[in-house]
Amino acid sequence: VKELFNSLVELGQHPKEMADTVTVMEKIGHFLDDEVTDLYQECKNNGLSKREASPVIAEKLPVAKILKRASKGWDGGYAMAGLFGHGVAFVLRDPSGIRPAFWYEDDEVCVVASERPVIQTAFRLKYDQVKELTPGSALIIKKSGKVSELKINEPRELKSCSFERIYFSRGNDYDIYAERKNLGKLVVDQVLKAVDYDLDNSVFSFIPNTAETSFYGMIKGLEDYLNDKKYQAILDLGANPAPEQLQEIIYQRARIEKIAIKDAKLRTFITQDDARDDLVAHVYDITYGSVVRGKDN
């Protein structure tokens, strides 16, 4: 922010405060003024009056160029939406794709949101009908209704926000759901090592509620591990295994319980740090009897 603030001062601007929103708006405003001034001078040279020049400037105003010049030097994640006075709206996404952005257009509306499922649900759409805004690009919506996605900045290495995808995003997104399930499968080896492969005395659950999808993936991974273990155990029994031995092997499964119960009306995430620990004690409760005290992992 300080770097952007100083660059504005060097350009002759006087931002009212050193805040990211203010400096970004001032930056866009500065280059907007530049382009308007140049276009007005062109109109004036062609003998147009101020009244006659206004619609010409509105029509020729290079929004993509303004965004490119203004966003030079920006870093971090953003999906920035704005509306110019002559009726052109835009959404600009960061080149690394840190912040998500999706859009949909038909003959009536153009909508942009940070999550695909909200657009799918609101407009009853299929997965492939909603487009992802390309990192470094801007969606520009003109007053006439024309919509175009234009490259503003060169895309960089994709660095999607892990907090956004793993914790905060809606779990019913096609990609997010698959990603969270896969994450659960990937931790299975570490979980098994942590409980010393003792599934008989280990109880598996999840917390917080957003971990549920990953939990399903972890259980699938545990089931795969158990199936391989059962298969080998049955082979080791030989040609004529006793029914009791087969039954003991086949009925082995991971112990799954709903251990932690959360009050849906309370949220720890938005709580001040100094009050969060106290609030957690009231937000979460335990299902008594689901764990054998002093024995279960």
Kindly label every feature range from the protein language model:
Residues 2-134, 140-202, 207-208, 293:
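Conserved short alpha-helical segments that host acidic/polar catalytic motifs at enzyme active sites
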Residues 28-29, 89-92, 213-216, 265-271:
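Short, solvent-exposed polar/charged micro-motifs at secondary-structure junctions
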Residues 139, 212-213, 259:
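Internal hydrophobic scaffold segments of catalytic domains
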Residues 145-161, 206-240:
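Terminal amphipathic helices with adjacent charged low-complexity linkers/tails
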Residues 189, 193, 220, 224, ...:
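Conserved helix-loop functional segments at active or binding sites
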Residues 223-297:
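Short, glycine/charge-rich flexible loops or terminal/linker lids adjacent to PRPP-binding catalytic cores
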